[in-house]
Swiss-Prot record:
Na(+) binds at residues 40, 45, 441. One of its GO terms (biological process) is response to copper ion. The gene is Mtco1. PANTHER family: CYTOCHROME C OXIDASE SUBUNIT 1. This is Cytochrome c oxidase subunit 1. The keyword Transport applies. It comes from Mus musculus (Mouse). Pathway: Energy metabolism; oxidative phosphorylation. Fe(II)-heme a binds at residues 61, 378.
């Protein structure tokens, strides 16, 4: 029965598929918003003609891409599909809660879209800072709807996190220790812990903002003894772990893809990889004020947050060099997934280097709120998180669907996307170094050249998205079934065939330990 299977599902594979489809669809919406942004900035002068609507688009682009594309696809899609298969569990620990986690997202998305449809929309940026987000600068229901949208997305993620933590700790075979689980399972576990600890703080902050707006409290209003800086601390205590939540599952995916296509039976430095992810997760919670170097922190506070932020480069470097060591001496297969993974390693590293530049509080005074910051986080998100999602998608597509993608189309898709994103975001470093500020719909003529190049790049990326849609259609239309899978003995998820049966591991799993 269609309704029973897809609306009331308690099956991790079906829910994972729902997450992947929802994330792909939201990704199209987010891409459309980004194209509007780049169309506006493609030449000097106004296109949309209104700065408020421009900022509404920027805000919606961020929320859609983060909460409705990257997180649902990585954690909800790949996490649901692969974690139970990789640890030999029959399903998730709480299958019905799993379904609720997914079905909280469409209403959340609806509220976000509704916020742009009423009044003037929420043109606050994704940070939703008061007083701009207060009830004077943003009168009307827009920001309130955005806050409710975030509440639903947050509850969804918290429930999902509880589910993953319970599943991974509790549903392994008795003989399997945590240090025998694959790196993707580790990455999801650490991500879930980060979600569980950071989201309640965001909920507190936006709830206080809600009461400031509607119930006359003054948490963030100096007139009543409040402080807008308190909101920034609460938001970024969530916001910084959040960016690691977005990339950690990607680290797990890349570890699997690189190992598989290097012909290795295990990644280089397994324990180091685990240690590095745990370190990144911990450090992610104690660096939040590096987003606030311009608000007037004490010099000793700035010194601490500068050095603490730089420390994160060490475990990140451990991971990058371990991936390179995994490649070393391998029988490398230049599959599309491997290309995405290699692109990830290179471009994520570039994004990390600009992050090190920004971690210097003195330099950040100049670079804060310029396009240098935009370039930095789009390198680690648009070429880190997205490349990881694409690597995982083309690698596990035969597992999810039972069909194979066309190799040539997949490689062409990678090439066009690679050119597009680099052409879009590399020039933004130059704009930032020249002082072009973020979140403005127009700019002085001096910035025209690189903005035009950047906007052209975004249209190349759009072409890549269209090719991807065609590539997926082509795979389902041609129905090339999977012949055989290499290395299934060290890649447990492939053990049951492509696609696996509806129920896997119905009897308890046993592991022989040597």
């Amino acid at each position: 029965m269609f309704i029973n299977r897809w609306l009331f599902s308690t099956n991790h594979k079906d829910i994972g598929t729902l997450y992947l489809l929802f994330g792909a669809w939201a990704g199209m919406v987010g891409t459309a918003l980004s194209i509007l942004i780049r169309a506006e900035l493609g030449q000097p002068g106004a296109l949309l003609g209104d700065d408020q609507i421009y900022n509404v688009i920027v805000t919606a682009h961020a929320f859609v891409m983060i909460f409705f594309m990257v997180m649902p696809m990585m954690i909800g899609g790949f996490g649901n599909w692969l974690v139970p298969l990789m640890i030999g569990a029959p399903d998730m620990a709480f299958p019905r809660m799993n379904n609720m986690s997914f079905w909280l997202l469409p209403p959340s998305f609806l509220l976000l879209l509704a916020s742009s449809m009423v009044e003037a929309g929420a043109g606050t940026g994704w940070t939703v800072y008061p007083p701009l987000a207060g009830n004077l600068a943003h009168a009307g229901a827009s920001v309130d709807l955005t806050i409710f949208s975030l509440h639903l997305a947050g509850v969804s993620s918290i429930l999902g996190a509880i589910n993953f933590i319970t599943t991974i700790i509790n549903m392994k075979p008795p003989a399997m220790t945590q240090y025998q689980t694959p790196l993707f399972v580790w990455s999801v576990l650490i991500t879930a812990v980060l979600l569980l600890l950071s989201l309640p703080v965001l909920a507190a902050g936006i709830t206080m903002l809600l009461t400031d707006r509607n119930l006359n409290t003054t948490f963030f209003d100096p007139a009543g003894g409040g402080d807008p800086i308190l909101y920034q601390h609460l938001f970024w205590f969530f916001g910084h772990p959040e960016v690691y939540i977005l990339i950690l599952p990607g680290f797990g995916i890349i570890s699997h893809v690189v190992t598989y296509y290097s012909g290795k039976k295990e990644p280089f430095g397994y324990m180091g990889m685990v240690w590095a992810m745990m370190s990144i997760g911990f450090l992610g919670f104690i660096v939040w004020a590096h987003h606030m170097f311009t608000v007037g922190l004490d010099v000793d506070t700035r010194a601490y947050f500068t050095s603490a932020t730089m420390i994160i480069a060490i475990p990140t470097g451990v991971k990058v060099f371990s991936w390179l060591a995994t490649l070393h001496g391998g029988n490398i297969k230049w599959s599309p997934a491997m290309l995405w993974a290699l692109g990830f390693i290179f471009l994520f590293t570039v994004g990390g280097l600009t992050g090190i530049v920004l971690s210097n509080s003195s330099l950040d005074i100049v670079l804060h709120d310029t396009y240098y910051v935009v370039a930095h986080f789009h390198y680690v998100l648009s070429m880190g998180a997205v490349f990881a999602i694409m690597a995982g998608f083309v690698h596990w597509f035969p597992l999810f669907s039972g069909f194979t993608l066309d190799d040539t189309w997949a490689k062409a898709h990678f090439a066009i996307m690679f050119v597009g994103v680099n052409m879009t975001f590399f020039p933004q470093h130059f704009l930032g170094l020249s002082g072009m500020p973020r979140r403005y719909s127009d700019y002085p003529d001096a910035y025209t050249t690189w903005n035009t190049v950047s906007s052209m790049g975004s249209f190349i990326s759009l072409t890549a998205v269209l090719i991807m849609i065609f590539m997926i259609w082509e795979a389902f239309a041609s129905k090339r079934e999977v012949m055989s899978v290499s290395y299934a003995s060290t890649n447990l998820e492939w053990l049951h065939g492509c696609p696996p049966p509806y129920h896997t591991f119905e009897e308890p799993t046993y592991v022989k330990v040597k």
